[in-house]
Amino acid sequence: MMKNKEIIERIKSKKAFISDMDGVIYHGNKLLPGVPEFVEWLKKEGKKFLFLTNSSERTPRELQEKMSRLGIDLEENVFYTSALATAHFLAAQRPGGTAYIIGEAGLINAMYNAGYTMNNYNPDYVVVGDTRSYSFEKIEQAVNLVLKGAKLIGTNPDLTGPVENGIIPATKALISPIELATGRQAYFVGKPNPPDDADCPQADRLFQ
């Protein structure tokens, strides 16, 4: 069995690092202990690194700004979200497609930038991500669109997400009523699904 010192030295020898964010880098709006020192070490040692999040709410720019508010300055291209993974996956499946989206700016912007058009009438996909603006009307519309043939996609399979005062319902919890009402199972793109399902150009650039 390796001792702690051996484990630390083995970690230090790595050239690149990929880290989760929610519950690893921060919890809500609080950095977790050791994070500033870890990020500073990554920069000082010239390590390549990428921060991944299954949350689809924020854009990479918004994540960059959040980290800056918490006292850590990073480049925008070190963040990769489940919204980006979903957009890249769907763009590969059906380039220039259409989607009805239940989600926040992070998901809407990612889909738009991937060449998708928003469509509330006869979309190729109904895409559900993390959101705080959930409503019965949106569920009703999503249900009817799926019954008409739209494929149901979730940005991640998480039931809940951590916040400072507890947890919040995440994508799998939000998409469940649509699955139950339609009898259709959603396809989820984010972790822990295989990385082949979603291209990650940020990783390609950083780790080449």
Language-model-detected regions and their locations in the chain:
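HAD-like aspartate-dependent phosphatase fold
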Residues: 1-21, 25-208
